[in-house]
Each structure stands twice: as C-alpha cells, then as structure tokens.
Amino acid sequence: YVLLLGTDGRPGEDTYRADSIILARIDPTQKQATLISVPRDTKVEYKGETMKINACHTVGGAEAMVEAVNELCGVQISHYAEVSFDGMQALIDSVGGIDINATDDVDDPEHLDIKITAGQQHMDGATALTYARCRYTYADGDYTRMRHQRQVLGALANQILNNFDATKIFGLVNSLSDMLVT
C-alpha cells in the first residue's frame, strides 16, 4: 500500500495538516491502482489522544499519518508521497495540464477564486487544484471533494502514462524533487 498525502502547508509554516489522505493499492500484475479516500475529519486515537486524522500530521508529520492510517485501515503501508498545494500545481503544470471531465461546477468566491464549469476540459495546475480543494458549496462537502481529488490523480496518471511529451521529463523530475517525500 502507498499513502498519498496532500498537505495544506504554506511557506513559513512549520506544522500543517494533511488536507487529502488517499490510500492506494497498486497491483502491478493487473496494471491497476485502487484509490480509497480517508475523510480528513475521521476521529482516531493517536499517542493516547483522540483527534481528527488530518491533525496527526501536525503532531508527527507524514510518519504519524502512516501510523494512523495503518491502524485505521488494518493495512501495512510500505511507501508514502507527500505534496503541498504549490507542489501539486507545479506538477500538473510540468506535464502540460490534465484532461478531466469535471462532474460538478465550482464557484466558491469566499475560498477559491477560480470558477469551473462541469464538463470535459483541459485544466492547468491552478484550476485542477481549485477543483480538488472545493468543498464548501456542496451538500456533502468533503465527499465531493474527495471524489474530485481522485479524479485529478487519475487524470494526472493518465497524462503521465499516455500523453506525456518525453522532452519535458527534466521539468517533471525537477518539480517532483522538491515536493515528494518517500
């Protein structure tokens, strides 16, 4: 299993939460990945305290998140990757953007400044990040956001595996080197 973490850290901050928590099971023989989102507000026991699972990151970083998700899901996570908001945006931009069928409109001027219309479109990093972050305008809030996050990851994987221009490989590697922790 691989734990994928999207963090809400901003420059100058020492501690931050995991804004996106996705457990991935990779099956290389079937060439298939299964993604399961863990709601960020899930209550867990960590180091004797009850807290939201996303707060484990503020206590012990990605290692604490691995421990908490292992315990919650009863699995053994062997690797993790962590990316910040800025890092995700740069990664998507480094591969030329992603093609995605947006299942919902995004219009949340109080929290995000990009509007998105539902339907098939090409998204740059800023637009894809907005699509993956929006939750306040949906009745089911975080559940729609988690679905959007999985869509963005799927579109990113598709772009890298099927549509990526190999001449941009150095830009991709450079963007990854600053943001991934394994």
Please state what every model-predicted region is:
Residues 1-182:
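Non-catalytic, solvent-exposed segments at the cell envelope interface
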